[in-house]
From Swiss-Prot:
Homodimer. Part of the ribosomal stalk of the 50S ribosomal subunit. Forms a multimeric L10(L12)X complex, where L10 forms an elongated spine to which 2 to 4 L12 dimers bind in a sequential fashion. Binds GTP-bound translation factors. PANTHER family: 39S RIBOSOMAL PROTEIN L12 (PTHR45987), LARGE RIBOSOMAL SUBUNIT PROTEIN BL12M (PTHR45987:SF4). One of its GO terms (cellular component) is cytosolic large ribosomal subunit. This is Large ribosomal subunit protein bL12. It comes from the Bacteria. HAMAP family: Ribosomal_bL12 (MF_00368). It holds the Pfam family Ribosomal_L12_N. The gene is rplL. Forms part of the ribosomal stalk which helps the ribosome interact with GTP-bound translation factors. Is thus essential for accurate translation. Keywords: Ribonucleoprotein, Ribosomal protein.
Length: 119
């Protein structure tokens, strides 16, 4: 299998399939996909402004179908997975988003009647 064929195969996978693939690679090669954690300096240093935000769907509201469509658009999940996420709120739908991206996602979801928190 060529590198291009592997890339095409990965492009066609769902988020859940990609998650399973990452876990299998971690187990097979004894590695981790977690990003290294930076150690914060001394207590005298000023705290840096938060740059990564989690977007949590607190409540789907009355227009659940529209919320599911937006969740699918944001996450790339399949219909079943997006519906399960929306049905089991509160759930984080996007982790590590930039402030701008988090606000954009929040606006899209609130536009269709969902209650959203950016943490």
């Amino acid at each position: 299998m060529t590198k291009e064929q592997i890339i095409e195969a990965v492009k066609s996978m769902t988020v859940l399939e990609l998650n399973d693939l990452v876990k299998a690679i971690e187990e097979e090669f004894g590695v981790t996909a977690a990003a290294p954690v930076a150690v914060v300096g001394g207590a005298g240093e000023a705290a840096a402004e938060k740059t990564e935000f989690d977007v949590e769907l607190a409540n789907a509201g009355a227009q659940k179908i529209k919320v599911i469509k937006v969740v699918r658009e944001i996450t790339g999940l399949g219909l079943k997975e997006a519906k399960e996420l929306v049905d089991n709120t509160p759930k984080v739908i996007k982790e590590g988003a930039s402030k701008e991206e988090a606000e954009e996602i929040k606006a899209k979801l609130e536009e269709v009647g969902a209650a959203v928190e950016v943490k």
